[in-house]
C-alpha cells in the first residue's frame, strides 16, 4: 500500500510540474556594485591615479567604495593613520603618505560613487575578539574618529560621503560568542557617535 501511495504522489508531482512550470525569468538580479580599498595601498596615489581607478570602478558598475581601516594599531601599540588627524591618541602615530579619506572623497565627489570610511583596526582583533582593553580602546578611538572625520570632510564632499564601515568584522568563532556583551558595548559607543553627527 505504501508503494502505491508513493507512486501516486510521484505522478501528481510530475503532472504539477508539467502543468505549472517554474518561471523562466529571474525574480531578482544579483548585482556586484561595491568594492574595498586598503589605505596603505592607496596612500601613495595621486589624483591622476585616483581618477584612473574611479574610471575603472565606474566601468565595472561600482557604486560604493569602502575604505578599509584608516587607523591601524599594531601589536606593539603603535598607530598608523591614513588621514590628517588631530586626535590626541594619534600624537605619536605614523601617518600614511597621503590623506586617503580626503583623496577618496575629493576624487569620488560628483562621480556617482559613494564612499564608506572604515574606522580603526588593531592586530589582535582576530585572536582577542572583544576581550581586553584593546577592543574597548578601539571603539572609543573610532567614535572620536567619526566626529573628527565627519566635521572635517562631510560638508566638503556631501555627494561622495555615504557612511561608515566597522572594520573588525564579526565572525562565528567561539571568542566572538563569549565576548558578545563586550562587542555590543563597543558597537553601541560607535553608534552613539554616529547618531551625534546627524
Predicted segments, located by residue:
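N-terminal secretory signal peptides that target proteins for export/translocation
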Residues: 1-4
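Bacterial Sec-dependent signal peptides at the C-terminal "C-region" and cleavage site
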Residues: 8-29
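Glycan-processing catalytic domains of CAZymes
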Residues: 27-198
